[in-house]
A protein has these predicted regions:
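Conserved active-site segments centered on acidic
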Residues: 46, 54-57
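Short, solvent-exposed loop/turn segments at secondary-structure junctions
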Residues: 52-55, 68-69, 111-114, 149-153, ...
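Internal catalytic-core helix/loop-beta-alpha segment
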Residues: 101-153
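Short, surface-exposed acidic-centric catalytic microdomains
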Residues: 56-123
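C-terminal capping/extension of enzyme domains
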Residues: 2-37, 41, 65-66, 119-132, ...
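Short, hydrophobic/glycine-enriched beta-strand segments
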Residues: 40-50
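Hydrophobic packing residues within well-ordered alpha-helices of enzyme cores
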Residues: 74, 154-155
Length: 236
């Protein structure tokens, strides 16, 4: 799938040249704040991690750790479209534009947390992102792809936040009950209400984590799972 070249990244700030040169140089605060979403109106699959690792927070970039296989897997999925190489002040915006042009988006489940190191098991006092912010910004969204188990734990809450359930239809007033008998013969009581026009159907899927901590899955096995989801939603 190839999207219009004018699809632009949606993120707040770019990392400084100093942080790009040495992402391990700056200390991190006790309370960590995540990165803004990278999405567009063309996003079909939203990839949700748990929370950026230390290297990603210092660089201000998603999946900046060189051993994370995220970008490597995406390149293997679309070999005909080279991923812009890492490094340099323009590399990350170019990578975000590349990702959006594939119909993807990226964000994390947690907006902030306390964590020593980069492991999900060390996350404490986490605050979940406000996914209602994406309602209306991603009209083509069809799937939320959870990059790992910690993210997938919140799959139900994410979907409910994205698209809250509609309230039940009001019951007929007592004085209107007699009017039910006068309805057309094909208006059968007890039939389900029609679906709301334009109401999206978004599914949640757990994908194997691209983190280097997920060493039990080979690269090829991860790639197969990721490819199946992208093909299912017409992105390959």
């Amino acid at each position: 799938m190839s999207l219009p070249p004018d699809a632009k990244p949606n993120f707040a700030t770019l990392p400084s040249a100093a942080s790009l040169a040495d992402p391990l140089a700056s200390p991190l605060p006790d309370r960590l704040t995540g990165l803004p979403p990278v999405v567009s109106e063309h996003t079909v699959v939203l990839i949700l991690g748990s929370f950026p690792g230390a290297a990603s927070l210092r660089a201000g970039q998603y999946y900046a750790h060189p051993q994370n296989q995220f970008w490597k897997i995406l390149q293997a999925l679309w070999p005909q479209h080279p991923v812009p190489p890492a490094g340099g002040p323009d590399a990350y915006p170019a990578r975000c534009a590349w990702l959006l042009a594939r119909g993807l988006g990226v964000w994390d489940v947690y907006a902030s947390c306390e964590r020593a190191g980069s492991l999900d098991t060390s996350i404490r006092h986490a605050v979940v992102n406000d996914f209602a912010r994406l309602h209306g910004r991603c009209p083509q969204l069809a799937a939320v792809a959870h990059n790992g188990g910690e993210s997938f734990r919140h799959a139900g809450a994410v979907l409910r936040s994205l698209y809250p359930p509609l309230p039940p239809p009001p019951k007929p007033l007592a004085h209107d009950a007699a009017g039910l008998a006068g309805r057309a013969r094909d208006d059968v009581p007890g039939q389900p209400e029609p679906t709301v026009s334009g109401a999206p159907t978004v599914v949640a899927t757990r994908l194997p984590s691209t983190s280097p901590a997920n060493a039990s899955w080979s690269f090829d096995r991860k790639l197969t799972a990721w490819a199946a989801l992208m093909a299912q939603h017409g992105l390959m």
